[in-house]
Amino acid sequence: MGRDTIADILTSIRNANMDKKGTVRIASTNITENIVKILLREGFIENVRKHQENNKYFLVSTLQHRRNRKGRYRTILKRISRPGLRIYSNYQRIPRILGGMGIVILSTSQGIMTDREARLEGIGGEILCYIW
């Protein structure tokens, strides 16, 4: 039985956010790197760097700070498709989170992308998670 690396990323970020940690360390795979790049581009995390320790690579992510307030952003990350129950959608039925304020991360034939990119490309895929 394999590990669910996507759920591990989301849980690590959620736990660090609730515990008011500034950084989170995630095991580096191709999928995790692509998801973290999307989170960085969309502004949910502030900085990412790759770290090597005993021939294993890790991604060290700095979480986004609130301006003019103490604490972190309240980011909600929800895993949708999981190894036991895959959820697929075509590009017309990709859900909109909070009227477009949140993002949906999809795994498509063109790679991992957000819901906006998938709608522009006109392709659907597996719905990995919701973030808002």
UniProtKB/Swiss-Prot annotation:
<dbReference type="InterPro" id="IPR047863">
    <property type="entry name" value="Ribosomal_uS8_CS"/>
</dbReference>
<dbReference type="InterPro" id="IPR035987">
    <property type="entry name" value="Ribosomal_uS8_sf"/>
</dbReference>
<keyword id="KW-0150">Chloroplast</keyword>
<comment type="subunit">
    <text>Part of the 30S ribosomal subunit.</text>
</comment>
<keyword id="KW-0699">rRNA-binding</keyword>
<dbReference type="GO" id="GO:0003735">
    <property type="term" value="F:structural constituent of ribosome"/>
</dbReference>
<keyword id="KW-0694">RNA-binding</keyword>
<comment type="similarity">
    <text>Belongs to the universal ribosomal protein uS8 family.</text>
</comment>
<keyword id="KW-0687">Ribonucleoprotein</keyword>
<dbReference type="Pfam" id="PF00410">
    <property type="entry name" value="Ribosomal_S8"/>
</dbReference>
<dbReference type="GO" id="GO:0019843">
    <property type="term" value="F:rRNA binding"/>
</dbReference>
<dbReference type="InterPro" id="IPR000630">
    <property type="entry name" value="Ribosomal_uS8"/>
</dbReference>
<dbReference type="GO" id="GO:0006412">
    <property type="term" value="P:translation"/>
</dbReference>
<keyword id="KW-0689">Ribosomal protein</keyword>
<dbReference type="GO" id="GO:0005840">
    <property type="term" value="C:ribosome"/>
</dbReference>
<protein>
    <recommendedName>
        <fullName>Small ribosomal subunit protein uS8c</fullName>
    </recommendedName>
</protein>
<dbReference type="GO" id="GO:1990904">
    <property type="term" value="C:ribonucleoprotein complex"/>
</dbReference>
<comment type="function">
    <text>One of the primary rRNA binding proteins, it binds directly to 16S rRNA central domain where it helps coordinate assembly of the platform of the 30S subunit.</text>
</comment>
<dbReference type="GO" id="GO:0009507">
    <property type="term" value="C:chloroplast"/>
</dbReference>
<keyword id="KW-0934">Plastid</keyword>
